[in-house]
Amino acid sequence: MRKVAIVAALEREVSGLTRNWNRVERQYDGRRFVFLERGEVVVACGGIGLDAARRAAEAVIVLYHPTQLHSVGFAGALIPELHVGDLIAASVVIDARDGSRAFVAGADNQSSLVTYMSVAGVQQKKNLAHAFGAKAVDMEAAAVAAAAVAHGIPFAATKVISDESNFELPEMARFIDPQGRFKTANFALFAALRPWLWRRVVLLAANSRKATRALSEHLELWVQDLSRVSEPVAATSGSHAEGGK
């Protein structure tokens, strides 16, 4: 079976999959990375955001020499038809900064995923849907796709909806540090002092648990089937400023 690398932002996004996997710490480019290994599959949890995802993707490529790179994790819905726990296998990943696109060769759907540089609120979700015609938004996939294209490695992206198109997330961007780590304790204190946020925070936590279960169940089956799946074709990239799927 080929070596497959999965890149996620946070361990909790894939906790159901990696609960009993081997945990390894390795250094790359002066930084410490945690990898979760089982057989020919390795998971790198590099942190939230484009920079963190780029670093994690480069590290896992150089250290493990995978034959496929897979971006997984949470995403926000841009269309009302998508609900918490729904999965989206992207056929194209769009970088909102410049409109560049990475196409997943062999994808049998028309699901566009756009990567945005910050946490997207309801209005920003509407703007992204209008500008790019995408179905969902995340904060990492475009960076992972760019690394895959640069190294000539096949790429895929599977995301699970953790917040629906009309769900206004609490203020979260300020609690993401430069390394892409979420400062949970700081956020908890911030929310605890603001009773008007409690309902949203409780719902967010429940949504995150549901999303984690759905993604982990999907990935468990995917990992089991890897040995029976033919080698994928490398992703291709292009630059298009206009929107559309």
Predicted regions and their residues:
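Short, conserved "active-site rim" segments that organize catalytic pockets and cofactor/ligand binding
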Residues: 2-21, 87
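Glycine-rich phosphate- or other oxyanion-binding loops that anchor nucleotides, phosphorylated ligands
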Residues: 3, 27-245
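Short linear motifs in intrinsically disordered
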Residues: 21-27
